[in-house]
Amino acid sequence: EMGDYYFRFHTQGQTLFYNDGAAWSNSTTYAIGDIAKHNNVNYYARTINSNQQPPNATHWYPLPTNPNIYEIYSPYSEAELFDVNYVQSADVLTTVHPNHAPNELRRYGATKWIIQSIDFGSPLAAPTGVSVSMYIPSSTSTSTDTYVDHEYVVTAVKDNLVDESNQSSSASVSNNIFVTGAKNTITWNAVSGASRYRVYKAQGGIFGFLGETTTTTLVDDNIAPDFAKTPPIHENDFVGTGNYPGAVSYFEQRRVFAGTNNAPQNIWMTKSGTESNMSFGIPIRDDDRIEFRVAAREANTIRHIVPLTNLLMLTGSAEWRVTSVNSDAITPTSISVKPQSYVGANNAQPVIVNNSLVYAAARGG
């Protein structure tokens, strides 16, 4: 249930209630979602905090009493509720509104719900302390005039092998690694949460993939970099007033957003197999995030995104079908958009019945 700046929860025809929290203590560090009692009022922790005495609206949300109805803070006012769009995936509800950054409402227990803005950046920090040392056999008669600069960057990778950090600061060294036995050794500091590291080498103004390791050292003994794979570039287009999406859904293992005030006919898809990874490389790869604009005669905000056999986008004046130019999955280079009809939809959330879409037509009311 969504109301004026609150969420309430119901299951099997019953409203959820909470138990009184322990007395608030200035020596306790509270996690988001914790309940503490102060001056006979129970408070829901909106942030991770300590020594922040309730009532403090930045950190605490007062809960109803008599009865103890469980509710949490919502960023949406009563006037905004009919324009909130949402999609559910298991215990995660994604909510969007053009006035607010995209949010996730997550269920951790019957009375443990948390709403937070979505972080579209990398979950890993970029490696630090990157350095490179050179070695060339002392018996080599090669002149230092033949030495060239070799520049490297490193990224951290999670155990899913998909989430990758931004590239580190670069480190370089001069050497002639074409000589037998010559090598460059790249080292860096470990990153919390990383299971592997990828090293990239510069050539022609771009960094190409050199190698991958589970340690914090890699040796380059004249390895040819692969420029089909480059360090990821993370972008978050949903920052600032006018840049928040008003529509959301899922399609082909991507979370899909659309319809900001500043780009009403743009659509964004996360990196394949991820929920919030908006990274891409140069050159573009098939699993990179997708961003495109629907070119149409009339500029109408995308109000709804509906996944069927094809992805459907509903605006106030038309319906659009998003497909691939071939029979494969949608990729950044294969995406195709065609008009389906010219009816238009209003703001009411569409409903899928079997394999059909039911939506309320836009009638100007």
What are these regions (language model features)?
Residues V96-H97, A101-T128, R255-F257, M269, ...:
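Beta-propeller fold recognition
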